[in-house]
Amino acid sequence: MKINVKGVPETMIQTLYARAKETSKENPKIKDEMAVSIVKQLDYDFSEANEDRTMSLGVIARTIVLDKMVEEYLNTHKDTIVINIACGLDTRCYRMKGKYVRWYNLDLPETINIRKQFLKETGPIYQIAKSAMDESYRDDIQYHGENILVIIEGLTMYLSENDIKKMFSIIDFKNSTVMVEVMLPFVVKHIKEKSIEGSRAQFTWGIKNGKELEKLTPSFSFLKEVSLVEGMKQLMPIYHVLGKIPFVSHVSNKIIVLEKHI
């Protein structure tokens, strides 16, 4: 199946390929058989993604870290609705099946149109074809006071500060927890990924830490942050040593956890 996407939406194809490639290894650190299946159906030039080791390692490290964080949350919050913002072709909802009440995959209409071709989701997994900055998406969520877990990965680095503020202002459910991936401003400015540049997507925004993000989103409280170095430790043992160097941990992308209680 041939697909034609450019810019930020194209990054979902590259991250999908990274997960499929890792899954196909003899001793994979993650297992995403659905990614393998989708990649086999795609008529797409994966050469740049195949050669971009930096991007691939980052995607797998992020998957390792977020899978662990999401599963731990769901294991202790049985009554939870998950909102996966900028879902792309993410398949975490299937790896976590049975641990949540409902799961909403939200992304731009062009992305959801592609997702629908491979993943038929009609409950308890649902699709919402809207922007994270479109407050009307809240009307598409069946909500009766359950815990809300919002996952935002691979998105904030392509937004503006105003976008970030808008996106968080829309998340006004009570008892909301947000797990959001962020990039350091230094990395936004100086680090390039071959496959990302090839898609014409550009990094545009970064933030130093969770406390700084809390200042931008005053209705949320900073809880903790986890460096993707924790995932890299499973991929490359040398990171058990490198991770102790403050600069290495600092410069890596992080998953920041914020909470809102109304």
Segment roles from a protein language model:
Residues 185-201:
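Short, glycine-/aromatic-enriched active-site segment of Class I SAM-dependent methyltransferases
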Residues 1-83, 87-130, 143-144:
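Rossmann-like AdoMet
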Residues 172-185:
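Conserved beta-strand signature within the Rossmann-like core of class I S-adenosyl-L-methionine
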Residues 158-173:
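A short, conserved alpha-helix within the catalytic core of class I
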Residues 231, 235-262:
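Core SAM-dependent methyltransferase catalytic element
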Residues 148-162:
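A short SAM/SAH-binding and catalytic strip from SAM-dependent methyltransferases
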